[in-house]
Design a protein with these regions (language model features):
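Alpha-helical subdomain
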Residues: 1-132
Length: 132
């Protein structure tokens, strides 16, 4: 982390990364980042425990990845507020609807996928802003 010059701000983006880490390791990383990079933002994707189980049964198995023993999962982004007093805000948006909502522009199949991802596996894009 010391190699990163964040003197003019920083945004960290991690897509599909934290599923491979244990929750306690993710918690330590987020806390360390909040201390090292005040005012920065961290954006990442998440899903709930059901979604993590589905990943374990499907694409990780198909990819031959067997050494992933514990997955980071998130039922509600508000859980993260308890992780560090250095978090200024924690917000989330639908993973499938993202920052530009296309729901009204897609067909029935995609609308069903969006609803599945939003309600059953709670796929989200999460943003943490660290305190200055």
């Amino acid at each position: 982390m010391d190699a990163i010059d964040a003197s003019q701000g920083a945004v960290f983006f991690a897509a599909g990364v934290f599923y491979y880490f244990k929750t306690e390791d993710v918690k330590r990383l987020f806390s360390a980042m909040s201390e090292r990079f005040p005012g920065a933002a961290l954006v990442f994707d998440s899903c709930n425990e059901r979604g993590a189980r589905l990943m374990r049964k499907t694409w990780l198995k198909e990819a031959g990845i067997t050494d992933v023993s514990a997955f980071f999962s998130l039922e509600d982004e508000k859980e993260l507020c308890e992780w560090s007093e250095s978090f200024a805000s924690v917000t989330a948006k639908s993973y499938m609807r993202g920052y530009r909502d296309i729901y009204k522009d897609v067909g029935l199949f995609h609308k069903l996928m969006i609803r599945f991802c939003d309600s059953l596996v709670k796929m989200k894009i999460v943003k943490i802003v660290f305190k200055e």
